[in-house]
Amino acid sequence: MIEITAEIRAFIDKVAVGVELAEDEYIDPSDGLIHCKKCGGQRQTVVPCFGKSGYFMPRCICQCQQEAEEQRKAAEERKRRMERIKRRKAQGLQDRYLYDYTFANDNGQNPLMDKARAYVENWKEAYKNNTGLLLFGDVGTGKSFFAGCIANALLDRDVPVLMTNFPTILNRLTGMFSEDRADFITSFDEYDLLIIDDLGVERSTEYAMEQMFFVIDSRYRSRRPMIITTNLKLAELKNPPDLAHARIYDRILERCAPILFAGKNFREENAGATKQAAKDIVNRKSE
């Protein structure tokens, strides 16, 4: 700010005549400029007219206004972020039940869940180093829940994640022309993390194996991490039955660290609880 000389002060006082003030403003007698009643900061300044004589007095923002503007922008960004997360969840979690696969819904019975939390907390490193996971083990041991918790936690952090399976992918590819299929597979690169659930449940036709290879190979070449869940044994993955499977499994094993799920069958336990709840309902007498 320039020094308020007698000449400038005379100019200020002349301009100030009849000026309209907001309710939270006043003219400070010490400099004749508009100030904020709350913080006392200037809302007006004096600037020389370069190239010619004279001055002009533009408005400026005080600390209160600056803070209010920052809060407004922060609120807008939070709103945009929440809307973006909502859209990404709708795109990335295509099955509604996956929304319930969260750390908040973890019953604490699977000690491997600490590894899922660690993966999320160290996501930046995992992404940078293209570190994926291979979750293998018997049916119902919590592999999909483990992967879903990671997906939801990262989506809540505004990380693009897609959790899908090969039957769904193959169904989408059916009827597409070759160029459309290539574009569809390439679209997976828009996601920082790709989760393929239940590898091995799809039909092993020549067409299916070819499309599966294209998906895994595209991900492999993009150097972006993926998480694979499967009921196959690690020995089956390391000793595939043919070249078509070998090309897929080799890429997965190179990029994904294996984690064995060998615990109890949570689905059987949940089914038992469901049966008991149903029994309680149907046997309950009307009041």
Language model segments and positions:
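A short, basic N-terminal segment
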Residues: 1-107, 269-287
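Pre-Walker A (pre-P-loop) alpha-helix and adjacent loop at the N terminus of AAA/AAA+ ATPase modules
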Residues: 93-133
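Short glycine-rich substrate-engagement loop in P-loop NTPases that contacts/grips substrate
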Residues: 111-120, 128, 151-191, 203-210
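Hydrophobic/aromatic beta-strand patches that form the interior of the parallel beta-sheet core
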Residues: 133, 162, 195, 227, ...
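Walker B catalytic acidic pair
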Residues: 198-199
